[in-house]
Regions:
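N-terminal, post-signal-peptide region of Sec/Tat-exported proteins
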Residues: 37-70
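A short loop-to-beta-strand structural motif that recurs across blades of beta-propeller domains
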Residues: 57-60, 99-103, 141-145, 185-189, ...
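Conserved beta-strand positions in repeat-built beta-propeller and related beta-rich domains
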Residues: 48-54, 91-97, 134-139, 177-183, ...
């Protein structure tokens, strides 16, 4: 089933602080009242896209001008959650409340929605990989892949009950897809050719991986939300290491990314801070978020411009950190 819509609202958001050196959060106040940015994504042109989950809009921020354009999703109260920009520039999102995937054409603003099978009732995090849109369905204990050419989605059950598949990322030398099983102490590796899954059990039963990234060597880094740890999994050996968050066991690490500076960036929801961890030295740097009450559910890296973008949920803001160049 296909749903089309074309409607937009354009306004301007000015940064709440002037551009400043790296390791400082520059905030952009969004003009829509009670805007709730959930996840960000950035295109090759530097445009920042985000999901406004509470108001069911897809937002577009031009950092050069501060201009913000809102695009309502065709399905009302769809609850757009995750977002990703495909290589062709298409902006894909998950309609978390209504079981949909959507694609926004950045040239026209038109949105095409795909209705997922009923079993995939709460699509969560999307990933463009190998020409398909992969996604997790947290409450349904499923993950799936949509073929945009046919509009058909294939669903795969997670073997572990109550797994709550959450964060999803592709990368590493073997091109695998990695999935955080937030309801368990497990991380899954998906073989994209056939969708088969291998689960890696973390040694601490209390571990709860929420978001994850993969570095160039294939090492999986993840935010252990329940224990206040940054985790490191080496798939080749199965070895797991924990690095305590500066904010302690109640810091609630959530969004995570690998910066152009080679550091692992993540947020501490319980402390309203961003942390940069250097894998080479194991040194951490903490950066305060200016506005209180921010929860960074996800991050996006603009590698071309050495910028880290944050969705500051609960504050009606996006955030930017200027990073060091690629190393």
């Amino acid at each position: 089933m296909l749903i089309l819509a074309l409607l937009q609202l354009t306004v301007t958001a000015a940064p709440t602080a002037a551009p400043v050196p790296a390791a400082t959060v520059v905030e952009y106040l969004l003009p829509r009242p009670k805007a709730f940015p959930h996840d960000p994504a950035v295109g090759r042109d530097g445009i920042v896209w985000y999901t406004d989950q509470a108001n069911s809009y897809i937002g577009r921020l031009d950092p050069a001008t501060g201009q913000v354009t809102d695009y309502p999703t065709p399905t009302q109260a769809s609850g757009p959650h995750g977002i990703v920009v495909a290589p062709d520039g298409g902006v894909w999102y998950t309609g978390n409340f209504k079981g949909r995937l959507g694609r926004l054409d950045p040239a026209t603003g038109a949105i095409k929605e795909y209705v997922l099978p009923a079993a995939a009732r709460d699509p969560h995090t999307p990933l463009y990989w190998g020409g398909k849109i992969w996604f997790t369905s947290q409450g349904a204990d499923l993950y799936g892949a949509l073929d945009p050419a046919t509009g058909q989605a294939q669903l795969f059950p997670v073997p572990t009950p109550g797994a709550r598949p959450y964060g999803l990322v592709g990368g590493g030398p073997d091109g695998s897809i990695w999935m955080a099983l937030f309801g368990t102490n497990k991380i899954g590796r998906i073989h994209p050719a056939d969708g088969t899954l291998k689960e890696f059990t973390l040694p601490d039963a209390a571990a709860r991986p929420r978001r994850l990234v993969v570095d160039a060597k294939g090492i999986v880094w993840y935010s252990d939300y329940a224990r206040g740890q940054l985790g490191r999994l080496d798939p080749a050996t199965g070895q797991v290491r924990d690095f305590p968050c500066p904010g302690g066991s109640g810091s609630q690490p959530y969004g995570i990314a690998i910066g152009t500076d080679g550091r692992i960036w993540y947020n501490e929801s319980g402390k309203n801070e961003i942390v940069a961890f250097d894998p080479a030295t194991e040194h951490t740097e903490t950066v305060a978020i200016p506005t209180a009450g921010a929860v960074v559910r996800n991050m996006a890296v603009d590698s071309s411009r050495a910028r880290l973008w944050l969705a500051l949920s609960g504050t009606q803001r996006l955030g930017r950190i200027d990073l060091a160049p690629q190393r």
